[in-house]
Amino acid sequence: MIDAGRAYAVGQGGRMVALEVTSGQRLWEQNLAGISTPAVAGEWLFVVTDDARLLCVARGSGKVRWMHQLPRYQNEKKKKGPILWVGPVLAGNRLVLANSEGQLVYASPEDGTVSATVEASSGPIGLSPIVANSTLYLLDDSGTISAWR
């Protein structure tokens, strides 16, 4: 994600970084692993990690403002059935994430608290939702596109 002359990236190798686009200078880094592009709003970045943590990170310093643990497994006790998360995107003053259980999850950008979980698909959702013209679009792993307002 590139915004205001800075690139923000997170990778499965375990690093989230902020880089100055023109010089390539590393401004900060965090020990976070993920595959989804961070969402940006004002002075904050929102990112979901491989271990199902939703975080709010300061754009300027990389300091974590808050962290919210999302469900990691279908059966948390036995650690069976891992749940994979994608997103977030900011839509209607809420963070929206999707997961491998076919769910859309709405969370507060203020503290990460989950306000709603919706069954959006009968199968996994492996791509982040996108927002265009006040509509949230989902493409599930079976190729079905759905639109949400």
List each language-model region with its residue ranges.
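Extracytoplasmic beta-rich repeat domains
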Residues: 1-4, 11-13, 25-41, 67-89, ...
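Structural signature of WD-repeat beta-propellers
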Residues: 4, 11-12, 49-50, 99-100, ...
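WD40 beta-propeller blade core
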Residues: 17, 55, 105-106, 146
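Short loop/turn segments that connect beta-strands within beta-propeller blades
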Residues: 20-23, 58-61, 108-112, 149
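Acidic (E/D-rich), amphipathic helical modules within compact regulatory domains
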Residues: 41-55
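Histidine/lysine/aspartate-rich catalytic loop segments that bind and position anionic ligands
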Residues: 55-73
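C-terminal hydrophobic structural anchor segments
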Residues: 85-109
